[in-house]
Structures are given as C-alpha cells and as structure tokens.
Amino acid sequence: MATKKAGGSTRNGRDSEAKRLGVKRFGGESVLAGSIIVRQRGTKFHAGNNVGMGRDHTLFATADGKVKFEVKGEKSRKYVVIVTE
C-alpha cells in the first residue's frame, strides 16, 4: 500500500525562453558595418546616422566607427549614432 497520498496536477510550471535583448555595443565602442548594436522590442532606441533598423527593430551599424548614444528632439528620444573616424 502507498504511504503517500497522490498529489494533484498543476497548471503552472512553464516559462518562455529568454530572448537576450538589450544593448550589445556600448557608447565609445568601435564597431564594423553590420554589427548589432541593440536588440529590442519596439523602438526604445531610434536609428540615427549610419545606423539601420531591422524588421524586429534591431539596430545595426551601416558604417565602421564608434557608437554614440544621444537624446534629441521634443520628445527626448534616444538615438544611436555611429561616428565615423
């Protein structure tokens, strides 16, 4: 005979896989064209000069240079810019 009463089932116990979002290259870092700078959901950061945006809002360098983060405009938007040497 069992000495332990049967436990009930649960509807919890699931979680989604981490998506590894965030800034990948920080201000002042040198990057090559095509390097991913920010992985994000939506436009937390906007694309500035020499920066492109992928269809999942990933920001990437379109030219070699140094990464710079700027806050511009009436709405104080955060822009990522590549400063070429």
UniProtKB/Swiss-Prot annotation:
NCBIfam families: L27. GO terms for molecular function: structural constituent of ribosome. Keywords: Ribonucleoprotein, Ribosomal protein. It comes from Haemophilus influenzae (strain ATCC 51907 / DSM 11121 / KW20 / Rd). GO terms for cellular component: cytosolic large ribosomal subunit. Residues 1-20 are annotated as: Disordered. GO terms for biological process: translation. The keyword Ribonucleoprotein applies. This is Large ribosomal subunit protein bL27.
